Amino acid sequence: MEPQLNQEVINTAAQHDGPIETDAVIVGAGPVGLFQVFELGLLEIKAHVIDSLAYPGGQCIELYPDKPIYDIPAVPMCTGKELTDSLLKQIEPFGATFHFGQEVSVVEKQEDGRFFVETSKGTKFLTKTIFIAAGVGAFQPKLLRVDGLDQFDNTQLFYRVKNPADFAGKNLVIVGGGDSALDWALNFVAEGPNKAESVILVHRRDGFKAAPASVAKMKELCDAYEMQFIVGQVTGYDEKNGKMTGAKVTGADGVTRVVPLDVLLVFFGLSPKLGPIAHWGLDIERKQLMVDTEKFSTNIPGIFAVGDINTYPGKKKLILSGFHECALAAFGAAPFIFPDKKIHLQYTTTSPKLHKVLGVESPVFD
């Protein structure tokens, strides 16, 4: 399900006796982090990209790889995976180096103005600039708190769906009232290769945060006896021979009923956590990094923040906004990397220099 990097892009880091010296380190390989590679590349700035996930795409891949996105300019509709794949193709010419499955644990300013960066896996860098594109930070699913339930993690209890085929033909109990819960309930009821044997949706109340159309469709399916909806909360489980056989659901009437199941899917949303970023000395407001809107610089010169991780007056958490921020951040970083060079704005439509950087032929006009 995860997007695949081409060999030219993956360029995994070779073994180094000392830190990897580079012009830019990007923290986060979501859509905004990937586009930051592009904007830096146009200025001939090469980057290393670090992400805690094992693959690129960030929230787009982790949360909604197959859900449609409608607000990317000139792309009427694409999925999170399609957007990620397109961005990976777009940044191929710039040969970014990716370091997956690791978090940045140390950031220290050096006497020469550079930053020493170390990851949780011990990868070390000396970089002139840092771009934080970490989305909402390290996001963790909100857990269903029932004593002993965690023993079934990733066998019968799941907080996300990586491969829908794994749940085909199963008796599913889905807990939650947001878009993810409703979307997956409808997905597993629908005819097709991933159709479940049965789907029961459990939510603590009759009101939902999900899209009204999804709620209406769910109720229509319940009326047709194709799925069930129960108002209540999961308060326990039945177990036999080390296997969960049912969820105990307590309704508003105080009565607890046992609902048979093969798999319990829980969608309570995500709890964003800044993680180590919170200890880097950056100005933070409500778990977001404060930036100026000229260069998207933080309070520490040389460290920039783009995408959902930042905040400023009028901030809108849109992928589109993040892309705009990447361009200004790249130009804002250029003086740290090329202090004696004046950077001119050039256009990819007409600049032979940019055509060379992109590896394309310059058009000849009559």
Swiss-Prot record:
Cofactor(s) needed: FAD
Pfam family membership, one: Pyr_redox_2
E.C. number(s) listed in UniProt: 1.18.1.2
Top EC category: oxidoreductase
Record InterPro entries: FAD/NAD-bd_sf (IPR036188), FAD/NAD-binding_dom (IPR023753), Fd--NADP_Rdtase_type_2 (IPR022890), Ferredoxin-NADP_redctase_2 (IPR050097)
SUPFAM superfamilies: FAD/NAD(P)-binding domain (SSF51905)
Keyword presence, Flavoprotein: yes
Keywords assigned: FAD, Flavoprotein, NADP, Oxidoreductase
Gene Ontology terms, MF aspect: ferredoxin-NADP+ reductase activity; flavin adenine dinucleotide binding; NADP binding
Similarity field: Belongs to the ferredoxin--NADP reductase type 2 family.
Subunit structure: Homodimer.
Protein name per its UniProtKB record: Ferredoxin--NADP reductase
